[in-house]
């Protein structure tokens, strides 16, 4: 039962005699912050009182008089300035727990009006190894797809791979100039990855040298500005004619100028690291000298590929499957699957048609030789074809949108892409209406950046993005140290062998990285800290997984060799036929928390917010821990009490397991 939705409907009825817009206030219902205020609380009376010219307590009293909830709640109470406190009847809690136990969906209702939803996520460039920057789109998109599917939506997942363009120009150039065909044929994945890294390093080296030459002047200007801003701020402190707010503004200006200097210095440090990595290596330095125009040469190879050059096209067809195998290996580790992997190459032959179609509609304009679409409300146009004839990402996105409309007829498309692409998506979505797709809801599910310990985007010392596989390996290694340490292993009965230890470390380590990402609000940045991620304390996957394992440990002991499936079925039958009872506040707290599972699922669905589910699972695990410490389950003298507590343990395990599965995280049966 989704209690907030039920309450909202009841409050609409109670509010109708008091206002013409009851829906404006009916949703002001929240779980109570403290059990002494009940289970749910409404503050609707406060804002409504201002509108109707009464005291908030009087309005609250009228609402309580009109409110018909005694079939579910004890008599509502008015507290403080006009809060309405509601405490659920224990009998309703018992019924809900019984129903959840008998329901394979653990009480989460399915939509009666399913929509076709396309979730576009991950989308790496397949020519290079996946890196830390790919983790957010991959795990957020996977979680949303799993949750929407569970809710009953008709979900189609699509990995819009970067399998065309410059990245393959880099590999082709690297293969032609540095590659050994025999080595590539014998061991394609590592050899192609190495060729990409080498060629790209030379490109980045040349770019870094060019950028560093201009940044010295920027730094000098920034330092001068910072010095001036500080002097002005310092002088203002003794100026009695200046208002405090003006002094504060000058201080902030000085601080911002100082941060600007620090930012430029950090960028210069990163550029110098890229340069030093090449200059300090004799072989790399020689290659950089011999291939000083590598960036231009790569663009030539890319252009030849786009034009259908037989040799480059043959190399692309040879290399692509190996590149896809490499990223699929990472997806297998992450337990992420896609319905479709239609990359940029799939749409290449459609791009000219997109430009022609937009031109026919009268939407295009030539500007400096490029074909553009000028959109109302935007300062700059959307460029769909450059003056040299090359197409852009925007053109591919438009071709993709047309294909998806014709092939899938979606109601909604979610683009799980980082926040830096916000302007692109605003323009792209603005194109939907003139293309006749205004009825499709397009959503940019944006997200922040993974940061290193220094608070900047996470990179290696040389300035490269850190490989995703190395992060996964590190997390698994640390997880094994935490959950398979000798003290813990000594308590395991039966003993835990090496293979099981490695399986659990993999489950915990991969889960830790996923959960750490999903537990943050998706639009915020977060610092990557593997030690915190695998910790057994705090809001971590490890803590939630351990809580699940504790439920299974109790049930194994209680089943006395009967086997968990049969034992849990017996618990279900007993809960359906025998009365439940609460003898401790922590029993009731756990039951109430379990009832709120559907509310957490709804937050993920409505707000594309996986962190709401993480928060719920963490709170459930904490509530279960309190229950476990204060409420003896096994060997209780009162059969009714033991039966109730066993039912709560079974349901806690199911809710934690299902919740983690929606996050894309596995569980271990023992830890």
From Swiss-Prot:
Residue ranges for motif 'HIGH' region?
Answer: 124-134
Instruction: State the Gene3D superfamilies in the record.
Output: Arginyl tRNA synthetase N-terminal domain, HUPs, Isoleucyl-tRNA Synthetase, Domain 1
Q: What is its EC number?
A: 6.1.1.19
Pfam families membership: Arg_tRNA_synt_N, DALR_1, tRNA-synt_1d
User: Listed GO molecular functions?
Assistant: arginine-tRNA ligase activity; ATP binding
Q: Which reaction does it catalyse?
A: tRNA(Arg) + L-arginine + ATP = L-arginyl-tRNA(Arg) + AMP + diphosphate
Keywords from the UniProt entry: Aminoacyl-tRNA synthetase, ATP-binding, Cytoplasm, Ligase, Nucleotide-binding, Protein biosynthesis
Principal cellular location given in the protein's record: cytoplasm
Q: This protein's superkingdom? A: Bacteria
User: What segments bear the compositional bias annotation Basic and acidic residues?
Assistant: 224-233
Tell me if Protein biosynthesis is a UniProt keyword of this record: yes
Question: PROSITE patterns this protein is in?
Answer: AA_TRNA_LIGASE_I
- Subunit annotation: Monomer.
The top of its lineage is:
Bacteria, Pseudomonadati, Planctomycetota, Planctomycetia, Pirellulales
InterPro entries linked to this entry: aa-tRNA-synth_I_CS, Arg-tRNA-ligase, Arg-tRNA-synth_N, Arg-tRNA-synth_N_sf, ArgRS_core, DALR_anticod-bd, Rossmann-like_a/b/a_fold, tRNAsynth_Ia_anticodon-bd
What gene, per UniProt, encodes this protein?
Answer: argS
Biological process according to GO: arginyl-tRNA aminoacylation
Q: What is this protein called?
A: Arginine--tRNA ligase
UniProt organism field: Rhodopirellula baltica (strain DSM 10527 / NCIMB 13988 / SH1)
Q: Where in the cell is it found?
A: Cytoplasm
Q: Cellular component per GO? A: cytoplasm
Q: Where is this region: Disordered?
A: 223-254
Coiled coil stretches, renumbered: none
The family database entries (PANTHER family) matched by this protein are listed as: ARGININE--TRNA LIGASE, CYTOPLASMIC (PTHR11956:SF5), ARGINYL-TRNA SYNTHETASE (PTHR11956)
């Amino acid at each position: 039962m989704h209690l907030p939705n039920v309450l909202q409907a009841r409050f609409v009825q109670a509010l109708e005699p008091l206002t013409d817009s009851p829906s404006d206030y009916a949703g002001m219902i929240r779980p109570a912050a403290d059990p002494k205020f009940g289970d749910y609380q409404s503050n609707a009376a406060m804002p409504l009182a201002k509108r109707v010219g009464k005291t908030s307590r009087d309005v609250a009293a009228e609402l309580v008089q009109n409110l018909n909830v005694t079939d579910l709640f004890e008599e509502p109470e008015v507290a403080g300035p006009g809060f309405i406190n509601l405490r659920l009847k224990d009998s309703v809690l018992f019924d809900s727990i019984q129903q959840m136990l008998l329901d394979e969906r653990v009480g989460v209702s399915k939509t009666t009006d399913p929509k076709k939803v396309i979730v576009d996520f991950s989308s790496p460039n397949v020519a290079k190894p996946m890196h830390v920057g790919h983790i957010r789109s991959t795990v957020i998109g996977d979680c949303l797809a799993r949750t929407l599917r569970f809710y009953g939506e008709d979900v189609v997942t699509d990995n819009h791979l970067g399998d065309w363009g410059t990245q393959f120009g880099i590999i082709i150039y690297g293969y032609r100039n540095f590659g050994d065909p025999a080595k590539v044929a014998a061991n394609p994945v590592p050899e192609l990855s190495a060729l990409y890294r080498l060629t790209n390093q030379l490109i980045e080296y040349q770019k870094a040298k060019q950028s560093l030459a201009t940044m010295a002047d920027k730094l000098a200007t920034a330092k001068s500005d910072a010095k001036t801003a500080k002097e002005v701020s310092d002088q203002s402190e003794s100026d009695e004619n200046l208002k405090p707010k003006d002094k504060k503004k000058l201080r902030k200006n000085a601080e911002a100028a100082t941060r600007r200097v620090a930012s430029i210095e950090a960028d210069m440090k990163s550029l110098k690291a890229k340069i030093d990595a090449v200059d300090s290596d004799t072989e790399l330095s020689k290659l950089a000298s011999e291939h000083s125009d590598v960036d231009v040469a790569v663009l030539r190879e890319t252009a030849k590929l786009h034009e259908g050059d037989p040799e480059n096209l043959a190399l692309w067809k040879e290399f692509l499957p190996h590149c896809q195998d490499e990223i699929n290996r990472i997806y297998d580790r992450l337990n992420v699957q896609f319905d479709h992997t239609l990359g940029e190459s799939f749409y290449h032959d459609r791009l000219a048609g997109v430009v022609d179609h937009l031109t026919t509609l009268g939407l295009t304009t030539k500007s400096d030789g490029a074909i553009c679409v000028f959109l109302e409300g935007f300062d700059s146009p959307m460029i769909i074809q450059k003056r040299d004839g090359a197409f852009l990402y925007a053109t591919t996105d438009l071709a993709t949108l047309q294909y998806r409309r014709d092939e899938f007829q979606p109601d909604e498309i979610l683009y799980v892409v980082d926040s830096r692409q916000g302007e692109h998506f605003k323009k792209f979505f603005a194109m939907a209406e003139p293309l006749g797709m205004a009825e499709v809801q397009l959503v940019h599910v944006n997200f922040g950046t993974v940061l290193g310990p220094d608070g900047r985007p996470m990179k290696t010392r040389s300035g490269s993005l850190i490989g995703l596989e190395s992060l996964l390996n590190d997390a698994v290694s640390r997880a094994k140290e935490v959950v398979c340490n000798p003290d813990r292993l000594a308590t395991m009965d039966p003993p835990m062998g090496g293979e099981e230890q490695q399986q659990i470390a993999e489950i915990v380590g991969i889960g830790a990285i996923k959960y750490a990402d999903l537990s943050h609000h998706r639009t915020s940045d977060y610092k990557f800290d593997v030690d915190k991620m695998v910790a057994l304390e705090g809001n971590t996957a490890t803590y939630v997984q351990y809580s699940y394992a504790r439920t299974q440990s109790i049930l194994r002991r209680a089943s006395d060799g009967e086997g968990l499936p049969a034992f849990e079925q017996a618990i279900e039958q007993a809960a359906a036929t025998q009365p439940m009872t609460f003898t401790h506040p922590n029993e009731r707290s756990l039951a109430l928390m379990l009832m709120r599972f559907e509310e957490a699922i709804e937050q993920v669905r409505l707000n594309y917010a996986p962190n709401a589910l993480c928060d719920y699972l963490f709170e459930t695990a904490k509530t279960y821990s309190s229950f476990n410490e204060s409420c003896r389950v096994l060997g209780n003298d009162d059969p009714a009490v033991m039966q109730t507590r066993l039912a709560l343990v079974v349901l806690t395990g199911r809710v934690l397991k299902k919740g983690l599965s929606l996050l894309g995280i596995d569980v271990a049966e023992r830890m």
